[in-house]
Amino acid sequence: MARGINKVILVGNLGNDPDTKYTQAGMAITRVSLATTSMRKDREGNNQERTEWHRVVFFGKLGEIAGEYLRKGSQVYVEGELRYDKYTGQDGVEKYSTDIVANEMQMLGGRGEGGGGGGMGGDRPQRTQAPRQQQGGGGGGGGQDYAPRRQQPAQQQSAPPMDDFADDDIPF
């Protein structure tokens, strides 16, 4: 039987500076809010904007890169997967959250917008034998057990220095 597909692609702007924290093992976990805006026409033919806010989480090396280079207002391309979590808040009430767990990132926009630079690919986090946490399905799908994810060592890709690069050098 074929496996399902859980893939999300977003292009949007950061609504906050990245929040990076590290696990006891030293793995970076970076969280951002990403805004995407779509346009549609209403019944009268007027353009209507709708902005959606997405919680995006970067792990490992990709989390370090996101935390270092992204800033509020930066435009970014993100690929990842949807993750539904269920947890008990400090008030004892069960809460649900939906995150995009990023495994690819591309900074967009010019230098003034906090973008530029090459693509950043994150290695897919792998399952570990660590204590498992219940991951609930939002609404009606049951939960699945997922271990906290750990990053595989990434191969370093060196990009040429961008110090002497000007927008006028682009031939198009």
Curated annotation (Swiss-Prot):
Record domain SSB: where: 5-109
Stored CDD domains: SSB_OBF
UniProt-listed InterPro entries: NA-bd_OB-fold, Primosome_PriB/ssb, ssDNA-bd
Native source organism of the sequence: Xanthomonas campestris pv. campestris (strain ATCC 33913 / DSM 3586 / NCPPB 528 / LMG 568 / P 25)
Alphabetized Gene3D superfamilies for the sequence: Nucleic acid-binding proteins
Keyword DNA repair: yes
Motif Important for interaction with partner proteins location, chain numbering: 167-172
UniProt GO MF annotations: enzyme activator activity; single-stranded DNA binding
Annotated signal peptide: none
Keywords: DNA damage, DNA recombination, DNA repair, DNA replication, DNA-binding
Annotated GO CC locations: nucleoid
Keyword DNA damage appears in the UniProt entry: yes
Low complexity compositional bias, start-end: 149-161
Name of the protein this chain belongs to: Single-stranded DNA-binding protein
Composition bias, Gly residues: 109-122, 135-144
Described purpose of this protein according to its UniProt entry: Plays an important role in DNA replication, recombination and repair. Binds to ssDNA and to an array of partner proteins to recruit them to their sites of action during DNA metabolism.
Subunit note: Homotetramer.
Pfam families recorded: SSB
